[in-house]
Amino acid sequence: MDNFISHIYAVENSTTIPSSNSYSLIFMLLVFLSIFYFMIFRPQRKKIQEHDRLIKSLSYGDEVFTSSGFVGKIVKITKTGYIVLELNNNVEVFVKSDFIVSIFPKGTLKNMKSM
């Protein structure tokens, strides 16, 4: 029993906690944050800015594509952020301007209808 207790004391005294360098931890954190910034935040911000420019450039008569799959011509742009799209003759829908994905070149709808 005495041998067992002395063995436990020897094991306790022989284990040392390695001291870690706090600078390496900070460096790794900065590396991960910079990778996260350049891989996620920056591209997302560019995408949002590009979409905002698209929304601001909308005008009457533009042919647009929405995220819900509608293709139509802008009939009216309201001040509240909604757009009235003409999908077909006498078929109009209200769409939130944030859901406009792209603007087609003029005459695209005529080409699509003739197909």
UniProtKB/Swiss-Prot annotation:
Sequence intervals crossing the membrane: 22-41
SMART domains: YajC
Gene Ontology cellular-component terms listed: plasma membrane
Subunit (UniProt): Part of the SecDF-YidC-YajC translocase complex. The SecDF-YidC-YajC translocase forms a supercomplex with SecYEG, called the holo-translocon (HTL).
Chief site of localization: membrane
Domain of life: Bacteria
Entry's localization field: Cell inner membrane
Keyword Coiled coil recorded: no
InterPro entries attached to this UniProt entry: Preprotein_translocase_YajC (IPR003849)
GO BP terms, alphabetized: protein transport
Protein's UniProt name: Sec translocon accessory complex subunit YajC
Organism of provenance: Buchnera aphidicola subsp. Baizongia pistaciae (strain Bp)
Membrane topology: Single-pass membrane protein
Family: Belongs to the YajC family.
Its job: The SecYEG-SecDF-YajC-YidC holo-translocon (HTL) protein secretase/insertase is a supercomplex required for protein secretion, insertion of proteins into membranes, and assembly of membrane protein complexes. While the SecYEG complex is essential for assembly of a number of proteins and complexes, the SecDF-YajC-YidC subcomplex facilitates these functions.
Keyword annotations: Cell inner membrane, Cell membrane, Membrane, Protein transport, Translocation, Transmembrane, Transmembrane helix, Transport
